[in-house]
């Protein structure tokens, strides 16, 4: 299941684990990324908490935790090469995997059609 937030994060949900990243729209707005800071595996976040930071030549921005949960894995590849976020934001450049405290809460997030309408 693919879901989106109004803060421009995407979530690919598989059971009780969501892979989280920023959308193509967000990556395009930020421009070329030069730095990514990710949370530590094992850290717990509530929905809306700042979980990661990205810096581009234009601005620094927070990446928010889309739902309550615990970080179970981070993508070291985007720390080593932030430009991956620009080239494949909704694929290889995921940010972290989140074990969801309440997987059903994802139903309240936007689906792809609603997100496309939101950014149109």
Curated annotation (Swiss-Prot):
Record keyword tRNA processing present: no
Record-linked InterPro entries: 2-oxoA_DH_lipoyl-BS, Biotin_lipoyl, GCV_H, GCV_H/Fam206, GCV_H_sub, Single_hybrid_motif
Sites of N6-lipoyllysine modification: 58
PROSITE patterns: BIOTINYL_LIPOYL, LIPOYL
GO biological process: glycine decarboxylation via glycine cleavage system
Keywords on record: Lipoyl
Signal peptide extent: none
Entry GO CC: cytoplasm; glycine cleavage complex
Residues of the Lipoyl-binding domain: 17-99
Cofactor(s), names only, from the UniProt record: (R)-lipoate
Family (UniProt): Belongs to the GcvH family.
Function recorded in the entry: The glycine cleavage system catalyzes the degradation of glycine. The H protein shuttles the methylamine group of glycine from the P protein to the T protein.
Subunit: The glycine cleavage system is composed of four proteins: P, T, L and H.
Protein name (record): Glycine cleavage system H protein
The organism of origin for this protein: Rhizobium meliloti (strain 1021)
Gene that produces this protein: gcvH
């Amino acid at each position: 299941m693919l879901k989106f937030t109004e803060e421009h994060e995407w979530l690919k949900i598989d059971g009780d684990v969501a892979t989280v990243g920023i959308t193509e729209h967000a990556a395009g707005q930020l421009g070329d990324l030069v730095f990514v800071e990710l949370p530590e595996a094992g850290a717990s976040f509530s929905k809306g908490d700042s979980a990661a930071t990205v810096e581009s030549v234009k601005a620094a921005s927070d990446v928010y935790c889309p739902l309550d949960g615990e970080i179970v894995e981070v993508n070291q590849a985007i720390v080593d090469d932030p430009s991956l976020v620009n080239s494949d934001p909704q694929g290889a450049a995921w940010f972290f995997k989140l074990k969801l405290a309440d997987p059903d809460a994802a139903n309240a997030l936007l689906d792809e059609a609603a997100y496309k309408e939101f950014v149109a």
